[in-house]
A protein has these predicted regions:
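TOPRIM fold recognition
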Residues: 56-142
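Phosphate-handling DNA/RNA-contact segment within nucleic-acid enzymes
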Residues: 1-88
Length: 142
């Protein structure tokens, strides 16, 4: 058994205690707040476990982490999907980046900020001291 999370190319990110990989095509996952028009805000995650952690924190009203406004959600499923991600970000006024507190995550935020400027918010500062949002939720410090 495993948890599978679909992407926009019909592939699936798959996780279980023994396996972390992709079935079919590797791509980003876009989860709109509602059908039709995009929101003005998007929350960007490196992996779907961080996205699920965000949803858990949102249910507990963690205002230190979560955005109190309607948002679309974009899961990169790997920082290697940055180029694909950049094309989807252009339609948003506010880009909230919940990426890992490591070199790859920070370089990715810098690249996005270099392209979209002041509309980019590095939310990883809210969970400094933790590798990622999932570790923050679990209380597992670096």
């Amino acid at each position: 058994f495993a948890l599978a999370f679909g992407n926009i190319s019909g592939g699936y990110e798959v996780r279980n205690p023994y396996y972390k990989g992709c079935i079919k095509n590797k791509d980003i996952s876009l989860i709109p707040q509602s059908r039709g028009e995009a929101q003005s805000r998007v929350c960007l995650f490196e992996g779907f476990m961080d996205f699920l952690s965000y949803l858990t924190l949102k249910q507990t009203d963690d205002s230190a982490i979560c955005i109190n406004a309607p948002c679309d959600y974009l899961v990169m499923n790997s920082v290697s999907n940055l180029k694909r991600t950049l094309t989807y970000l252009q339609k948003y006024t506010y880009i909230h980046c919940y990426l890992d507190n490591d070199l790859a995550g920070q370089k990715t935020v810098e690249t996005i900020a270099g392209m979209y400027g002041r509309c980019v918010y590095n939310e990883s500062n809210c969970y400094a001291g933790y590798k990622d949002l999932n570790d923050y939720l679990r209380g597992k410090k670096q």
